[in-house]
């Protein structure tokens, strides 16, 4: 029996080594031209399908500009976009089939992404090349939704690394119902409203590291659906680590949490990042009818540059209401607790915290700021919070008072005008 197990183990290792050593499938061998004029959709898709049929491996796109419509990546497949190589989205909407997607927190029809994978394990997109989305005439579509750049749905152990993307007025990466996802070394550029960088939507186990994201809308947005159906589905976005990144939004926030958060957002860590936003560096946002929760959100070792607000909190927003809002005088509001930021350096920030748009019916519990230094014009404005902890707030250039509160309980509030 032991010999049999040893033989099986050796065979498994040998098979794995063989799979790893399979030569990459070159899309040119399947008819791709890479001339920037010919549509290479069929050829590239054939290479991807052949890779899956072979039990997995790599597909190589290199040395050219490859015009393509929507492509589907299967399990155990690595798509490599080599240096000095571009994938460019077609301008023909017929090249993006309509499927069921989650958009603005609810399920509806939408055009399939330029690159997509669905319910697939071990999908990787890598390489030093670039991915350019469809022109604005397509990305601005809303009914049905236009094609996002990359969309992973229900995938496990997916990795996106080292490439560059450019898009406008629609999301670059939408990661939905995924588990164990990594984005590493990406350079993401977008312009315009809805031009998010990475949207993490009801996912568990997300690492975003060493990325440079400069966007129109939120650089990174954490979501989990909106309304009673999303709350009952109970698929939170959780166990998220964002580290060693540069995040900038030219319209909204470097990191947005909500407003679509009815399934919950929890266990989020932002570490060793340089962040800035046109409105907020970090924006915690929701409204009545969302329900759900946000908890265990932390940031440490951050540099905040030239932002009107370091942390903005608006739980009374007028964002799009769900078709099935969560009912109840208290339950309709999100439960927000255990929010902490430590060792933060701010530079040319107008306000440290704008946190007064919070419902009295559901105060935020356990909000802490520790060791905040730098320059700001206005300080910390809080309302409807319990267990607030402020310590080591060493900023200069502000207009008094440093701390303004209304219906707030906690420690370190001595400089506030109200208790």
Residue ranges and their predicted role:
Residues 18-419:
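Extracellular/periplasmic carbohydrate-active domains that bind, remodel
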Residues 1-4:
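Positively charged n-region of N-terminal signal peptides that target proteins for export
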Residues 6-16:
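Bacterial N-terminal signal peptides
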């Amino acid at each position: 029996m032991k010999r049999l197990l040893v033989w099986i183990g050796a065979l498994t290792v040998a098979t794995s080594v063989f799979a790893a050593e399979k030569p990459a499938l070159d899309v040119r061998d399947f008819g791709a031209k890479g001339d920037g004029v010919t549509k290479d959709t069929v050829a590239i898709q054939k290479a991807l399908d052949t890779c899956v049929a072979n039990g997995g491996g790599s597909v190589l796109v290199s040395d050219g500009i490859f015009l393509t419509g929507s492509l589907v990546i299967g399990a155990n497949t690595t798509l490599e976009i080599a240096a000095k190589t571009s994938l460019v989205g077609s301008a023909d909407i017929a090249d993006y089939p309509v499927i069921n997607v989650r958009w603005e927190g609810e399920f509806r029809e939408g055009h399939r992404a330029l690159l997509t994978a669905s319910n697939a394990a071990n999908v990787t997109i890598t390489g030093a090349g670039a991915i350019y989305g469809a022109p604005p005439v397509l990305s601005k579509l809303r009914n049905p939704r236009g094609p996002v750049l990359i969309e992973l749905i229900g995938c496990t152990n997916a990795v996106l690394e080292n490439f560059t993307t450019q898009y406008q007025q629609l999301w670059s990466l939408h990661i939905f119902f995924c588990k164990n996802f990594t984005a590493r070394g990406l350079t993401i550029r977008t312009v315009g409203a809805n031009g998010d960088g990475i949207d993490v939507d009801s996912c568990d186990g997300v690492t975003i590291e060493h990325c440079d994201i400069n966007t129109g809308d939120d650089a990174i947005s954490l979501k989990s659906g909106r309304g009673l159906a999303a709350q009952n589905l109970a698929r939170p976005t959780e166990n998220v680590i964002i580290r060693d990144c540069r995040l900038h939004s030219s319209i909204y926030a470097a990191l947005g949490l909500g407003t679509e958060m009815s399934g919950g957002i929890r266990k989020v860590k932002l570490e060793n990042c340089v962040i800035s936003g046109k409105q907020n560096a970090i924006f915690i946002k929701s409204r009545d009818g969302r329900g759900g929760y946000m908890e265990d959100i932390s940031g440490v070792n951050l540099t905040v540059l030239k932002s009107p607000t370091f942390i903005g909190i608006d739980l009374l927003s007028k964002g799009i209401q769900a078709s099935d809002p969560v009912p109840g005088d208290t339950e309709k509001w999100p439960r927000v607790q255990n929010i902490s930021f430590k060792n933060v350096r701010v530079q040319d920030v107008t306000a440290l915290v704008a946190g007064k748009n919070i419902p009295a019916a559901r105060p935020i519990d356990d909000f802490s700021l520790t060791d905040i230094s730098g320059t700001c014009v206005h300080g910390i404005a809080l309302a409807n919070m319990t267990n607030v902890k402020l310590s080591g707030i060493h900023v200069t250039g502000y207009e008094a008072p440093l701390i303004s509160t209304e219906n707030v309980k906690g420690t370190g509030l001595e400089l506030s005008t109200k208790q």
